[in-house]
């Protein structure tokens, strides 16, 4: 089934996943970081101070995600999605109205937990559970919401900040989230597989069984995959978090940097869709071990380049891996460990990802304050992804897909 026919047949569910992923933008680093300079100036914070606040809020988010993510195994996407959207709307409004520095860690926690954590988690778990044979396409399509937000929201809000006060723009974000609530409610009036009331569709994973989260943590493949799971979140988050400072040391304006983000997003969307197609066509094991190699080139280029053309090339390499990263890790949890406890297992993966996004900004901020430049840090990031690629390759070779037996307890359509 091609993409267009697939979308036409499943438009309501795919659009709901797209909207949830798009609204997650307001809790993502690429959005919050465009206000970094304003927030640091308003509250008189150094790079290390701001990085520490961001790290504290994000670490708290990662801790809560381990348990909160399991709610997607219990409640309808319609109910939990609406609840999280309302919470994110209130959190962005709180950022606009906040007068005190001590409130920042709490606000960052809410933005990161609801935006970065829960919304993409709900979207990806729903796509993985609702679709079986076309899981790759479903994940790729829903994840374009995140990619479009990453491309256009930083540019739009950076331009608006030239005219409007930064706090007023958080009110705009709040209104946008709130307006999506009735749309999600209508789109998911009839869910594809309402988890709490319908007969389940269960796809078993490695060794033909459903894995619990405890079993996953005890499995060696999990530990071989761990650097690859945490790495993109830590390193890519750091890149976007330090974008204002990075532009400054390269001699560019902030607007010149964010103007290149649409290029990044176009490439990310293309490779998001390609990875979804390749996942369904060739299987996860053939593409998973190699998808982080472009990140090696990206971060090494960020170390060397001094022109915007060079930066654009680096962003393209980064986008190739980022696009695939939107689809492949979620498919990994579903295919290797099954879908019966996918919400609980994926919550662990999301918590690890959120943990990485906490460590990255905090670490880079401290190192900058201590005189270790961001460009040198990016070179080390490139070497890190060589290491994670090697471990993925070893893990997939040892735990090969011929040990995976997919069984479907109650099949729906082939889609």
Regions found by a protein language model. Give the residues of each.
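Extracytoplasmic gate region of multi-pass secondary transporters
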Residues: 28, 32-36, 220-272
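Extracytoplasmic
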Residues: 12-47, 68, 239-244
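Helix-loop-helix hairpin linking two adjacent transmembrane segments in secondary transporters
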Residues: 142, 146-193
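Symmetry-related core transmembrane helices of the 12-TM Major Facilitator Superfamily/SLC fold
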Residues: 170-186, 377-395
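Helix-to-loop junctions at the C-terminal end of transmembrane segments
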Residues: 64-76, 272-283, 368-369
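Hydrophobic core of transmembrane alpha-helices in multi-pass small-molecule transporters
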Residues: 102-118, 230, 310-324
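Intracellular juxtamembrane helix-capping segments at the cytosolic ends
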Residues: 118-131, 324-337
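Structural signature of the two symmetry-related core transmembrane helices
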Residues: 79-93, 286-300
């Amino acid at each position: 089934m091609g993409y267009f026919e697939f979308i036409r047949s499943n438009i309501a569910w795919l659009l709901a996943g797209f909207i949830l992923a798009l609204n997650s933008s307001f809790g993502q680093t690429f959005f919050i970081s465009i206000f970094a300079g304003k927030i640091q100036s308003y509250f008189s914070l150094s790079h290390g101070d701001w990085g520490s606040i961001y790290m504290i809020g994000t670490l708290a988010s990662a801790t809560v995600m381990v348990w909160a993510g399991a709610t997607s195994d219990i409640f309808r996407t319609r109910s939990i999605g609406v609840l999280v959207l309302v919470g994110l709307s209130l959190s962005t409004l709180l950022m606009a109205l906040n007068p005190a520095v001590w409130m920042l860690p709490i606000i960052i926690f809410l933005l990161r937990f609801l935006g970065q954590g829960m919304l993409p988690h709900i979207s990806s778990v729903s796509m993985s559970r609702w679709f079986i044979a076309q899981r790759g396409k479903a994940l790729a399509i829903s994840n374009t919401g995140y990619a479009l937000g990453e491309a256009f929201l930083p540019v739009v809000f950076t331009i608006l900040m030239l005219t409007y006060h930064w706090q007023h723009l958080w009110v705009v974000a709040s209104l946008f989230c709130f307006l999506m609530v009735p749309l999600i409610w209508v789109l998911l009036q009839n869910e594809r597989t309402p988890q709490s009331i319908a007969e389940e569709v269960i796809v078993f994973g490695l060794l033909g069984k459903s894995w619990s989260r405890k079993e996953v943590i005890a499995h060696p493949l999990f530990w071989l995959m761990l650097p690859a799971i945490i790495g993109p979140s830590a390193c890519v988050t750091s890149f976007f978090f330090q974008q204002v400072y990075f532009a400054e040391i390269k001699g560019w304006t902030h607007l010149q940097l964010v103007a290149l983000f649409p290029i990044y997003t176009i490439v990310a969307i293309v490779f998001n869709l390609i990875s979804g197609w390749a996942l369904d066509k060739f299987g996860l094991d053939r593409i998973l071990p190699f998808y982080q190699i472009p990140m090696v080139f990206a971060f090494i280029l960020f170390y060397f380049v001094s022109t915007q053309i060079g930066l654009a090339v680096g962003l393209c390499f980064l986008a190739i891996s980022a696009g695939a990263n939107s689809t492949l890790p979620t498919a990994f949890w579903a295919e290797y460990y099954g879908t019966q406890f996918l919400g609980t297992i994926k919550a662990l993966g999301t918590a690890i990802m959120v943990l990485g996004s906490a460590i990255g900004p905090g670490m880079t901020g401290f190192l900058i304050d201590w005189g270790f430049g961001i460009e040198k840090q990016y070179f080390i990031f490139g070497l890190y992804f060589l290491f994670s690629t090697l471990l993925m390759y070893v893990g997939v070779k040892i735990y090969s897909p011929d040990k995976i037996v997919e069984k479907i307890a109650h099949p729906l359509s082939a889609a």
